[in-house]
Amino acid sequence: MRTPDFSAIWQASKQLTARIILLAFATFALYVFHDLAFPQGAAAYPFWAQQTAPETPREATGRIVCANCHLAQKPAEVEIPQSVLPDTVFEAVVKIPYDLDSQQVLGDGSKGGLNVGAVLMLPEGFKIAPEDRIPEEMKEKIEGLYFQPYREDQENVVIVGPLPGDQYQEIVFPVLSPDPATNKSIEFGKYSVHLGANRGRGQVYPTGELSNNNAFKASKAGTVTEISQTEEGGYSVTVTTSEGDVVETIPPGPELIVTKGQQVAAGDALTNNPNVGGFGQKDTEVVLQSPGRIKGLMVFLAGIMLAQILLVIKKKQVERVQAAEMNF
């Protein structure tokens, strides 16, 4: 185990109270209803992971399942104290950076701002702090957020989102550490923390169907002989091959980059790639520190300091005796 970070321990020891804000379920329900009723508009946000992997969001390989729908890789960070004391509340700060000037393709083909979402896998026994335990200062940081357990019996795995990205590039999770004195299944030591965070819409729905947030490609080699616009605002591209005509249907959103009469090979892009978002994953660690160990260490350090002081005093006494003998 690493040497304790005393600044982090001291900070954690001052956080004696904590709480989580329970807010507008109706607002969250509105988000959920919108995404279920119009899935093209906000695909593959954290709760979609619950459908594709209901047991755990982390695969055996260590990959978070959100990466199955968000194919582009983007950075994500999580900042937590190096060590925490039992039964204390601390902040886990998730950072989801992106260019705020970016505009993503929405389900209807129009452009709009990016949303963000995250899944935070805490160690067993750690959970979102109840409202009455959250300090007022921290409560201000989590105002407007709704944290949901990944499963009803899995409080240590938490999801949040979708949220407007221009307001929530940083998301604060108020986390309550467990107490081994009351929970015998928990032990002091070092534990892993896993984060998965996305910004923007995904490229694949949980059903495996592609969203319109993709670059669409030719399935066969041939010549583009016809391009027509569909009623929905997309395109129908006819490619004449040696085996006949192949019609490629492109939903609204991506921009065509081919023209009539152009030769294309199988796999060539017919459109640009409109995706400006992506998924990021980050792993870190936290130490659940024993107060007894800290006290013992403090006593040990105090003993060393006392021994040094006594040695200095003893040295002075010896020097006085030697000086007296020389004068005699």
Curated annotation (Swiss-Prot):
Q: Which UniProt keywords are given for this protein, alphabetically ordered?
A: Electron transport, Heme, Iron, Membrane, Metal-binding, Photosynthesis, Signal, Thylakoid, Transmembrane, Transmembrane helix, Transport
Cofactor(s) named in the record: heme
Q: Which GO terms describe its cellular component?
A: plasma membrane-derived thylakoid membrane
Domain of life, per UniProt, equals Bacteria
- Where, in this chain's numbering, is heme bound? 45, 66, 69-70
Where does the record say this protein resides? Cellular thylakoid membrane
- The residues forming the signal peptide are 1-44
One Pfam family it belongs to: Apocytochr_F_N
List GO BP terms, alphabetically.
Answer: photosynthesis
Query: Which sequence ranges are marked TM in the entry?
Result: 294-314
Q: Name one GO molecular function term.
A: electron transfer activity
- Membrane topology reported for the UniProt record: Single-pass membrane protein
Entry keyword Heme: yes
Q: How is the cofactor bound?
A: Binds 1 heme group covalently.
Assembly and interaction partners: The 4 large subunits of the cytochrome b6-f complex are cytochrome b6, subunit IV (17 kDa polypeptide, PetD), cytochrome f and the Rieske protein, while the 4 small subunits are PetG, PetL, PetM and PetN. The complex functions as a dimer.
UniProt similarity note: Belongs to the cytochrome f family.
What function is annotated for this protein? Component of the cytochrome b6-f complex, which mediates electron transfer between photosystem II (PSII) and photosystem I (PSI), cyclic electron flow around PSI, and state transitions.
Q: What is this protein called?
A: Cytochrome f
The source organism is: Rippkaea orientalis (strain PCC 8801 / RF-1)
Taxonomy, top ranks, is: Bacteria, Bacillati, Cyanobacteriota, Cyanophyceae, Oscillatoriophycideae
